[in-house]
Amino acid sequence: MTSRFMLLLILGLVVTVGAISISDVAFAKKIASLTGDQVVPPVSTDAIGHATFKHPNSSTMNYKLNISGIVHPDKIDIHAGKTGKNGEVLVDLMKHAKQQATKVGVIVTGSFNASDLIGPMQGKTVLDLVDSMKSGDTYVSVDTQKHPTGEIRGQIELANSPSSNVTSSIKVGNNTSTS
């Protein structure tokens, strides 16, 4: 009887740990480092940025962008497209965004849900967008008056580890600040 109990206990732990691991991967952070040389065609700019995307549940995506060298972005969007390719807008991140000016640029935060998805993602779910993000099929673009088709851009990718504590960072000259 004791060995049967131990077997059931071990199986229960394996199932629980497996469920936690699957959940961690499903809701892992997505990140993007934005630069002018990733824009298609590339642009010359000192602006840079870092974006972090988290989805605390299957219907909501939260985001934070730290942008240096741009004070007033005109548009910030998630697009469909692999590295080196332009694509359609999937989400207008400025629609629900809050902007906070910094000494070197702006911090943009917000969230969206499935009703905010447009273009090829219209009618789909946030998890469908997450699948595209995991596949490397999405990028973030920040447009300005000077560069209306994109001043900085970055492919969205899965953070190094689902359990890692990803911080947003901005490199300014030789200094890096994190938040």
Regions found by a protein language model. Name each.
Residues 21-76, 80-179:
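Metal-centered catalytic cores of metalloenzymes
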